[in-house]
């Protein structure tokens, strides 16, 4: 047990989320518990991880979640480990919710995206159809997130664009999408900033500069692609060519990278297979599976197209393998699934209470110690 690597989870504690500040000590080696010296609260070693309050051995849970993330059938896992189906689904829900928090904490941070591709997947559901929309940063192959909806409409695309905006800086940005009519309006609606003019009322919104939109429209006949047309909806040809050269090394407008990511998700989630018998019964189950697969893809899987050469003496060369998270600068090493499941997402920083009058000296000292 290392008190220097954990933090207090009490949101009302001034030291909440602070690591290595000396406020955490070991409370019980036998019960594997820590104590915060500031608020006096104790918490388990597994607090904030997937293994919190689970009685099953960590190795078993980690193996089961790893198999689920890489597409092993649920029935095979239940037979191999002697587990109940509801238990395995409960662990998948835990892991999916934890991976969503990790994704929102680490991936949804502003960065220069360059080029983003987005697409939707039609999912068979018991009694209906679901649509899964996802986006990817082309240069680093980073999965930017996904959303689910019962309809392929504007609300689905707007929710996806909000995910992309959480990860984007106001820089030159190219969107390559399919022929869905909702993309153009959703991008123009989401990527706007208010203009503060000091006047009362709602401020006017100004669109981002440097946004380019390109569409790839496929024409089908007898379930086969017979023609592909590419069109520029917004932006100039020179700007789009420059972004294509910087993000994918040249070429033409395409959606190949998001379609390849769709194939990865189809191989890991049985309900996404085109001609299969697996159906989605609940939207939350697919939501958790999507975040589990996407986060493992970002942090725990090497991508062959991301490797870079490392030149050695005597004309020798070795390849330095990278994950999408390494290529995006989020981490510097390959994460194991255990490292992902035990990553603790810190709570929001503590805010001093708002009271009338002057703050007390005790409150000033807390603010100076923990809010600086």
Task: Please give the residue ranges for each predicted region.
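Residue-level recognition of single "structural anchor" positions
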Residues: 1-372
């Amino acid at each position: 047990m290392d008190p220097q690597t954990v933090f207090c989870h009490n949101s009302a504690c001034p030291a909440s989320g602070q690591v290595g500040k000396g406020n955490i000590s070991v409370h019980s080696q036998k019960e594997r518990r820590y104590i915060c010296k500031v608020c006096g609260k104790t918490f388990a070693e597994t607090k904030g991880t997937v293994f919190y309050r689970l009685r099953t051995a960590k190795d078993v849970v980690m193996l089961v979640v790893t198999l689920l993330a890489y597409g092993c059938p649920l029935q095979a896992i239940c037979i191999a480990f002697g587990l109940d189906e509801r238990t395995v689904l409960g662990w998948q829900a835990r892991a999916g919710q934890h991976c969503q928090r990790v994704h929102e904490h680490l991936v949804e941070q502003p960065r220069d995206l360059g080029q983003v591709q987005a697409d939707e997947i039609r999912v068979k559901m018991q009694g209906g159809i679901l649509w899964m929309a996802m986006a990817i940063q082309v240069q680093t192959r980073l999965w930017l997130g996904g959303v689910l909806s019962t309809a392929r409409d504007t609300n689905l695309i707007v929710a996806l664009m909000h995910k992309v905006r959480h990860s984007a800086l106001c820089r030159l940005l190219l969107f390559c999408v399919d022929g869905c009519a909702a993309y153009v309006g959703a991008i123009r609606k989401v990527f706007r900033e208010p203009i503060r003019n000091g006047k009362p009322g709602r401020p006017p919104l100004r669109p981002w500069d440097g946004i380019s939109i390109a569409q790839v429209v496929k024409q089908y006949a007898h379930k086969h692609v017979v023609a592909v047309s590419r069109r520029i909806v917004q932006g100039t040809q020179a700007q789009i060519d420059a972004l294509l050269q910087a993000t994918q090394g040249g070429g033409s407008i395409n959606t190949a990278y998001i379609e390849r990511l769709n194939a990865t998700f189809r191989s890991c989630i049985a309900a996404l297979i085109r001609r299969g018998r697996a159906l989605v019964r609940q939207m939350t189950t697919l939501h958790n599976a999507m975040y589990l697969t996407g986060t493992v893809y970002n942090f725990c899987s090497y991508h062959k197209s991301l490797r870079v050469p490392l030149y050695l003496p005597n004309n020798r060369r070795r390849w330095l393998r990278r994950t999408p998270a390494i290529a995006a600068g989020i981490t510097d090493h390959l994460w194991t699934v255990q490292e992902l499941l035990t990553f603790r997402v810190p709570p929001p920083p503590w805010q001093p209470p708002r009271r009338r009058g002057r703050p007390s000296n005790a409150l000033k000292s807390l603010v100076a110690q923990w809010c600086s």
